[in-house]
Curated annotation (Swiss-Prot):
Domain of life where this protein originates: Eukaryota
GO molecular function, one term: DNA binding
Binding sites annotated in the UniProt record for Zn(2+): C12, C15, C29, C32
Endpoints of the signal sequence: none
Subcellular location, record wording: Nucleus
Name under which the protein is recorded: DNA-directed RNA polymerases II, IV and V subunit 12
The protein's assembly and partners: Component of the RNA polymerase II, IV and V complexes. Associates with the mediator complex. Interacts with NRPD1.
Keywords per UniProt: DNA-directed RNA polymerase, Metal-binding, Nucleus, Transcription, Zinc
GO BP annotation list: DNA-templated transcription
Function, in words: DNA-dependent RNA polymerase catalyzes the transcription of DNA into RNA using the four ribonucleoside triphosphates as substrates. Component of RNA polymerase II which synthesizes mRNA precursors and many functional non-coding RNAs. Pol II is the central component of the basal RNA polymerase II transcription machinery. It is composed of mobile elements that move relative to each other.
Keyword set includes Zinc: yes
Family the UniProt entry places it in: Belongs to the archaeal Rpo12/eukaryotic RPC10 RNA polymerase subunit family.
Amino acid sequence: MDPAPEPVTYVCGDCGQENTLKSGDVIQCRECGYRILYKKRTRRVVQYEAR
């Protein structure tokens, strides 16, 4: 059995409130109901190989 995915934090495009969503949740701000959410930037190092 796979471990449960961690909830991801999103920022509302209207009011700026942070929202934590899990898979299957409605993509909507919990404060104002706005439907455009932006994913927060990850803290881990992301490195790609250039060719």
